[in-house]
Amino acid sequence: MLSKRLLNFESFEVMDILALAQKLESEGKKVIHLEIGEPDFNTPKPIVDEGIKSLKEGKTHYTDSRGILELREKISELYKDKYKADIIPDNIIITGGSSLGLFFALSSIIDDGDEVLIQNPCYPCYKNFIRFLGAKPVFCDFTVESLEEALSDKTKAIIINSPSNPLGEVIDREIYEFAYENIPYIISDEIYNGLVYEGKCYSAIEFDENLEKTILINGFSKLYAMTGWRIGYVISNDEIIEAILKLQQNLFISAPTISQYAALKAFEKETEREINSMIKEFDRRRRLVLKYVKDFGWEVNNPIGAYYVFPNIGEDGREFAYKLLKEKFVALTPGIGFGSKGKNYIRISYANSYENIKEGLERIKEFLNK
């Protein structure tokens, strides 16, 4: 019999859609992928070259479980330059992707019966991780009023994802301020930080430079197109980092060595130029998707970050997504996979080429007008 903890895990809706899309492709159909949250760009050349160089130099062994010092120093410098925050390398641990960092963060602070506040809708792994660890996810709107209602004596943490998946929104300052005043721990998932096209996106560091309550999760997958390299990091206080270090030592030893060395080049000027070019292209695609979505008559917020648009289509999103995929071979993610409030929504990922996105949107237009 399987573990009871695993029974609380729900399937990942986007992967179910992807599996069907790939089956259709194996049958010769041309599927337009607007479901996957993965940059279509290749990893910038300086990063790839450094990865190859590290292999040739024999850097294929374990590293310090905290991660190589050079990379932690680079991350420390990044937060000092961007936020004037004095984050020392010892308050940083490198992980095998930001999802692992998130799991470590939750594992280090929550016990059976604790409650963790999460946004509805939000990244599906949040609720699965929380339940797996014996705690309870509490879904709420990210307004002060909703958070006040959700608080209880069992509240241990809140997960703030900004820019958010699937909404593409950034979280308001008042939400951070409320969280720091009322909640023991703030887990700040900032994996899309940097992918912002207008306005201001806060970092938790701006509200808690001493890291008394903050567990900041970030990585290289989204901004640097390094999804397959599996490299992320956690920033927090000494107590939390030491707890995560124990988990890392026992479960994973260290993050992938070649990925750590390759990531050193993420901070180079040449890489920065490539990233800026990617961001401009993402913004161009965002504007294209928003134009079509509004022409379809769908209600939509103003997504200013990440690479998702999350419209209300006025009907069951799951039924719509599967029917669209089978009839027009366009893959979208049903909104219900992100929370109960996503039932009549779909998520459109614009992490695909401009041409493919336009073709996919034209197919949706045909589907709606049939």
Swiss-Prot record:
Catalytic activity: 4-(hydroxymethyl)-2-furancarboxaldehyde phosphate + L-alanine = [5-(aminomethyl)-3-furyl]methyl phosphate + pyruvate
Modification N6-(pyridoxal phosphate)lysine occurs at: K222
Keyword Membrane included in the entry's annotation: no
InterPro entries found in the cross-reference section: Aminotransferase_I/II_large, AspAT/PAT-like, NHTrfase_class1_PyrdxlP-BS, PyrdxlP-dep_Trfase, PyrdxlP-dep_Trfase_major, PyrdxlP-dep_Trfase_small
Pathway: Cofactor biosynthesis; methanofuran biosynthesis
Cofactor: pyridoxal 5'-phosphate
GO process terms (BP): amino acid metabolic process; biosynthetic process
Source organism (scientific name): Methanocaldococcus jannaschii (strain ATCC 43067 / DSM 2661 / JAL-1 / JCM 10045 / NBRC 100440) (Methanococcus jannaschii)
Assembly, per entry: Homodimer.
Protein's UniProt name: (5-formylfuran-3-yl)methyl phosphate transaminase
